[in-house]
């Protein structure tokens, strides 16, 4: 990621903080006055223009100030995130007391999701720890003569190979079928064969039968139970006043809440911003997640979900705090 000049870093950070607090576009004069930037309004305005050219700020209306773009939030999270405040330290102390009052894991996770939502104002999810079976991440299809080589790629990057008879006259379907399975896995972590396009039926059904025999090798996100709290907090955010944005979120919550939290290499501690998330229903959201482990090798996830306009430093520290606490309790 490109390293910004110091002035642009200050302006981007101030713009993010202003927008998180006010939900209003901001101009250079307000930034100077509110954040005490040691620069003139003209200098700050020039820096804002440079950030807009780099795609880190956007102007929602011609006469308005500027707000962070998804790329701007990403740069902020990766390079400019401040240390969390004292409130997170108080949360750690509170969790220590809370841990003395739980009898069953479900009860504990329910209390923790409620506390996370109360602390951050965001929707919280905690998945129950699952055995470390691998998840299917991708399928690669290679036609050779009358055979079809199938490479199953797990989220651990390990592979398993199948060799199928290629149905007669279906070789032209292979590339499109691979793209379709990729889309399915990226969106929900599983394949909905009921939505297989008619033009891919011949080759697709052969692949479906082969994968059915391998289903014990991988686990599906839909098998993972999740405790959820604060859905009403999420849909009450101004960003989701449009029902067309809320409906996909609620549908996903009803069908497969664990899909809010992608799994795989490098996702043990991660922030998804907008369209980075593999599920299109979350293209207007940010998801902060951190994994925890129990004493039997099972892995669960702690996550917060909200609009891209969120207090990332506090939210990320809170998620990490709860995950760390669960690691300690369950190890």
UniProtKB/Swiss-Prot annotation:
Put simply, this protein is called: Heat-inducible transcription repressor HrcA
User: Pfam families annotated for this entry?
Assistant: HrcA
- Entries under PANTHER family matching the protein: HEAT-INDUCIBLE TRANSCRIPTION REPRESSOR HRCA (PTHR34824:SF1)
Assigned protein family: Belongs to the HrcA family.
Query: Could you tell me which HAMAP family the record lists for this protein?
Result: HrcA
Q: Does the keyword Transferase apply?
A: no
Q: Which GO terms describe its molecular function?
A: DNA binding
């Amino acid at each position: 990621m490109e390293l910004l000049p110091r002035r642009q870093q200050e302006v981007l950070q101030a713009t993010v903080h202003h927008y998180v607090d006010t939900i209003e576009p901001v101009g250079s004069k307000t930034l100077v006055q509110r954040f005490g930037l040691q620069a003139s309004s003209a200098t700050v305005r020039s820096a804002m223009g440079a950030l807009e050219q780099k795609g880190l700020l956007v102007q929602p209306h011609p006469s308005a100030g500027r707000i962070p773009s998804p790329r701007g939030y990403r740069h902020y999270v990766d390079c400019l995130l401040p240390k969390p405040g004292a409130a997170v330290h108080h949360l750690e102390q509170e969790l220590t007391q809370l841990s003395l009052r739980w009898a069953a894991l479900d009860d504990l996770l329910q209390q923790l999701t409620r506390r996370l939502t109360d602390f951050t104002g965001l929707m919280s999810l905690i998945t129950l720890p699952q055995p470390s079976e691998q998840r299917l991440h991708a399928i690669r299809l290679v036609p050779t003569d009358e055979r079809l080589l199938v490479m199953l790629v797990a989220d651990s990057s390990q592979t398993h190979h199948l060799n199928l008879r290629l149905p007669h006259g279906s070789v032209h379907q292979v590339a499109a079928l691979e793209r379709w399975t990729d889309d399915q896995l990226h969106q929900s972590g599983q394949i909905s064969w009921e939505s297989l396009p008619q033009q891919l039926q011949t080759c697709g059904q052969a692949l479906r039968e082969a994968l059915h025999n391998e289903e014990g090798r991988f686990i599906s996100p839909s098998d993972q139970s999740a405790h959820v709290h604060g859905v009403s907090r999420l849909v009450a955010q101004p960003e989701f006043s449009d029902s067309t944005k809320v409906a996909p979120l609620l549908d996903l919550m009803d069908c497969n809440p664990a899909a809010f939290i992608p799994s795989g290499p490098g996702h043990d501690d991660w922030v998804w911003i907008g369209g980075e998330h593999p599920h299109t229903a979350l293209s207007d959201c940010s998801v902060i997640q951190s994994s925890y482990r129990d004493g039997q090798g099972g892995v669960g996830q702690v996550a917060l979900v909200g609009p891209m306009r969120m207090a990332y430093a506090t939210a990320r520290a809170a998620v990490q705090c709860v995950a760390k606490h669960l690691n300690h309790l369950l190890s």
